[in-house]
């Protein structure tokens, strides 16, 4: 479950940093190809048991590498391609595609799983192949490539190892250890978490001393960048594990209790989650477009307040709830998350200098992926804690009521809560193996049929699982309110005006290009497009930014067409334009490159 997320989270910042140096589109294209190759390899996993499981884990790691290349660059590419007054809408449309793909995959996976579990991985292949070809043919580099910078290899190693230890430690923390229902007392878990945090502390200290750091710590001096990432982290921590928990609730408990056969439960669980997707589809582009005009503060804050209200509503649901209020709360949850996501992402990307957008996008995605991984552990730890307190008594009472001897029932009631939870999720009743055959043979036929039925475990877990969910939803309310507070503290709308500096560099310096197969150099096409003209100046001779900083209540004007940073239109698909900086241009921009804190 965590291998893909683990690899993606550890590589996101590195992928973003590499894309700043060698090109975002190039790495984005590679992401499609690698992810598709990983999906094909997963489909061809052979056999059963440990060997097949190991192969599947390795190939999922390959998918994670491709996913990191994609996630690290999507927001940066959109920020480069769209003017500031359209970026919120662009982010909203992008996130709609991601969410629609996620739930579309759940639906298709539910159908294909009834045929062959390997076929689930085929869902990604046609989209991946199309994306690889389309991105290669249609996407062109619009960012300035800075290949002269060096990759921080020691920093990459420290970050990857430290984060891996932390995430692995938290993952194994939900496994039983000794007589405990969870592994928080396991010395290995404690050692992994402490060791990982220590390496991350060393990483942060080292990043302050290298000339080309992997993690641009100075970006946290920008208030909107810092507040936006804190809000995004808390938001992902609140909702990251929510989808899986809700699917477990539906697929493992609610649907079987309402007469659905287990083989149909995965498909119907995805169908019943659609109201959340609908809410996101409604709110995402709308809030993004409005935030382009009015700023992200009100929409991102309001979105998290709606999310918190939805979690409060989940607290009021009974164990055997009606679907109508459940669907309404899912819709609220989707609206809240959609209203928050695209304005928050756009405000983060608007706040940073263009030359750091790849690294900034990777940092933003890393915070969200790490929070989602930690959320999975947090939510399941809270649910398992609730199960631990009430499951043994419920299990003992149900077994003795069915005629199981007290001693046998007492032994069975010590089953690990995690095992019981996933047994219900997988549609497996372990009573046939836990209860001795001689005891089962001595039970009346009706009692034996009840104990061995597929509905026995869902009925047994419904109450204890609901107790754990109450604790988890309460924590999610607090985290959502924290994200709302961070969103509000981002301050007034701010868009970094460093694009003018980049335009000045392009205008004042010769353009270094490659010659395309058609024979015409990009330099001539750039001159024809207007590059080389001087940017507008104020009466004092200073450069006039096209986007004032901060902006309050007005839409920023898009940059003139003649100020593009890079032209890429040669027949051989991509010819990056590399502009060099001059001391005169840097000195002319001194007053424009320091964002308010």
Q: Predicted segment positions?
A:
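Transmembrane-helix bundle of Major Facilitator Superfamily
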Residues: 1-137, 287, 312-315
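Transmembrane core module of solute transporters
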Residues: 1-7, 185-191, 195-199, 211-355, ...
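Interfacial helix-cap and linker-helix signal at transmembrane-aqueous boundaries
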Residues: 18-19, 108-116, 170, 174, ...
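Juxtamembrane helix-start motifs in multi-pass secondary transporters
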Residues: 26-30, 34, 296-302, 472
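Cytoplasmic loop-to-transmembrane helix junctions
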Residues: 30, 86-93, 268, 356-363, ...
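Small-residue-rich alpha-helical segments with characteristic i,i+4
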Residues: 95-96, 100-103, 232-233, 242, ...
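Hydrophobic transmembrane-helix bundles of small-molecule transporters
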Residues: 115-232, 238, 523-526
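Transmembrane-helix exit segments and adjacent C-terminal regions of multi-pass membrane proteins
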Residues: 205, 224, 292, 304, ...
């Amino acid at each position: 479950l965590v291998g893909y997320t683990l690899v993606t989270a550890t590589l996101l910042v590195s992928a973003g940093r590499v894309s700043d140096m060698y090109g975002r589109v190039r790495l984005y294209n590679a992401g499609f190809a690698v992810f598709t190759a990983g999906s094909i390899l997963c489909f061809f996993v052979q056999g059963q048991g440990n060997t097949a499981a190991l192969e599947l884990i390795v190939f999922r790691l390959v998918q994670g590498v491709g996913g990191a290349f994609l996630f690290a660059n999507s927001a940066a590419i959109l920020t480069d391609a769209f003017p500031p007054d359209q970026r919120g809408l662009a982010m909203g449309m992008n996130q709609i595609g991601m969410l629609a793909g996620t739930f579309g995959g759940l639906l298709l996976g539910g159908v294909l799983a009834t045929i062959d579990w390997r076929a689930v991985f085929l869902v990604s292949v046609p989209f991946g192949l199309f994306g690889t070809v389309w991105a290669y043919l249609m996407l062109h580099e619009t960012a300035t490539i800075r290949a002269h910078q060096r990759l921080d290899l020691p920093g990459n190693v420290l970050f990857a190892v430290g984060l891996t230890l932390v995430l692995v430690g938290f993952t194994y923390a939900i496994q039983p250890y000794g007589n405990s229902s969870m592994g928080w007392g396991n010395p290995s878990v404690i050692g992994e978490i402490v060791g990982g945090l220590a390496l991350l502390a060393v990483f942060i200290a080292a990043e302050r001393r290298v000339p080309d750091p992997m993690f641009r710590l100075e970006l946290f001096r920008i208030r909107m960048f810092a507040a936006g990432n804190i809000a995004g982290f808390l938001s992902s921590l609140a909702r990251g594990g929510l989808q899986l928990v809700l699917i477990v609730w539906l697929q493992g408990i609610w649907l079987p209790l309402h007469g659905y056969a287990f083989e149909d439960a995965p498909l119907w669980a995805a169908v019943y989650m659609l109201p959340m997707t609908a809410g996101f589809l409604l709110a995402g582009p709308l809030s993004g477009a409005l935030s382009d005009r009015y700023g992200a503060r009100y929409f991102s804050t309001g979105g998290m307040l709606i999310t918190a209200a939805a979690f409060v509503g989940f607290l009021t649901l009974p164990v055997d709830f009606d679907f109508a209020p459940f669907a309404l709360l899912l819709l609220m949850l989707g609206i809240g998350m959609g209203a928050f996501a695209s304005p928050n992402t756009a405000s983060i990307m608007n706040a940073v200098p263009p030359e750091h957008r790849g690294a900034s996008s990777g940092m933003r995605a890393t915070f969200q992926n790490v929070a989602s991984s930690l959320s999975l552990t947090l939510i399941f730890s809270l649910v398992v804690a609730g199960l631990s307190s009430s499951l043994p008594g419920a299990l003992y009472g149900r077994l003795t009521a069915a005629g199981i001897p007290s001693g046998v029932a007492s032994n069975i009631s010590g089953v690990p809560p995690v095992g019981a939870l996933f047994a219900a999720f997988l549609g497996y009743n372990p009573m046939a193996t836990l209860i001795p055959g001689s005891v089962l043979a001595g039970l009346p036929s009706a009692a034996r049929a009840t104990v061995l039925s597929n509905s026995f475990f869902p009925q047994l877990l419904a109450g204890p699982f609901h107790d754990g969910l109450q604790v988890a939803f309460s924590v999610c309310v607090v985290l959502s309110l924290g994200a709302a507070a961070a969103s509000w503290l981002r301050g007034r709308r701010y868009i970094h005006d460093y694009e003018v500096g980049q335009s000045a560099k392009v205008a004042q310096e010769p353009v270094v290009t490659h010659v395309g197969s058609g024979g015409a150099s990009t330099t001539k096409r750039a001159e024809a497009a207007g590059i080389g003209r001087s940017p507008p100046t104020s009466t004092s001779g200073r450069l006039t930014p096209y986007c004032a900083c901060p902006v309050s209540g007005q839409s920023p004007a898009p940059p003139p067409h003649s100020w593009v940073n890079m032209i890429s239109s040669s027949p051989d698909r991509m010819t990056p334009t590399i502009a060099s900086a001059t001391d005169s241009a840097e000195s002319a921009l001194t007053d424009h490159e320091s964002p308010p804190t």
